[in-house]
Amino acid sequence: MLVRDDFLIVVPMRICEPHAHMCARTTHDYEAMAKAGIEVIVEPAFWLGETRKYPGSFFDYFDHLIGYEHKRAATYGIRQYVTIAMNPKEANDRDLGKAVVDELPRFLEVDHVVAVGEIGFDAISEAEEESFVRQVELAREFGLPLLIHSPHVNKYEGIQKLLEVLGHLDFPMEKVLMDHNTEETTEMSLSAGAWAGHTVYPISKISPERMANIVEKHGIERMMINSAADWGPSDPLMVPYTIEELRRRGVVEEDIQKLVWDNPMSFFSQSGRIS
């Protein structure tokens, strides 16, 4: 059984955490994650809690993810990769968003940047859609997959519109990770040909038990789970906790391993920068 304060005792399994904001976490968290079997972390660029006012604030943040967090993870034997983008929440400041997106190419060239993200919708606004389209084209230019943030409110409508835009842009759906799915949207994401990400963040998203229900219904093909651990009431060990729940339900080890390792590694390997 997992015991958070004792770090973890768990049957060995390779784990890739495909979405965690480790810049908001402590070194204690890195140590616990390593002991739980997490070998790889993908850290997406996103909102920091306080809306930024200047393009340079984003560039310093991107440098921090690419540089310092990469080294900090390595201290605990964890390989860290990054996704870089202008997030949808702050893209509603059009001038700021344009200035940031204009400079993204120099960050997307970095060899451990493995996707463009998080992009997508927050308020499902025109400004967010404009920023989304520009960054999809950057992903195409750099041969990178997309990590897409689906909105917390009106999620079904938001994902439906995002899929429509991607269809108009003729972006390959096998290179799309539609994240933060719930019971009402998983089927839509999968049917479109995208990968379906799910965030186990019990207070505002889904619990390990709900995630296990989704796996029992939809299987494991093109499915992923993550903690999206950040500065909120989250836990970077939610993937290991969900593994325990899946085992309790009788899901076979090979399927769990595919869900928490093979799938995220296969998706991000489309960048040509991870193996």
Residue ranges of model-derived segments:
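Short acidic/histidine-rich active-site segments
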Residues: 218-236, 256
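Short, charged, surface-exposed secondary-structure boundary motifs
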Residues: 51-53, 205-212, 233-235
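Conserved active-site and cofactor/substrate-binding residues in soluble primary-metabolism enzymes
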Residues: 28, 157, 209, 237, ...
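Short helix-capping segments at alpha-helix termini
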Residues: 74-76, 168-172, 217-219, 248-254
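Short, acidic/turn-prone active-site loops that include or flank metal/cofactor-
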Residues: 45-49, 200-205, 229-230
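Mid-to-C-terminal alpha-helical segments outside catalytic/metal-binding sites
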Residues: 2-9, 240-275
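Mid-domain alpha/beta scaffold segments of enzyme catalytic cores
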Residues: 2-142, 148, 153, 160-161, ...
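Catalytic pocket-lining loop regions of alpha/beta-barrel enzymes
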Residues: 133-217, 221-224
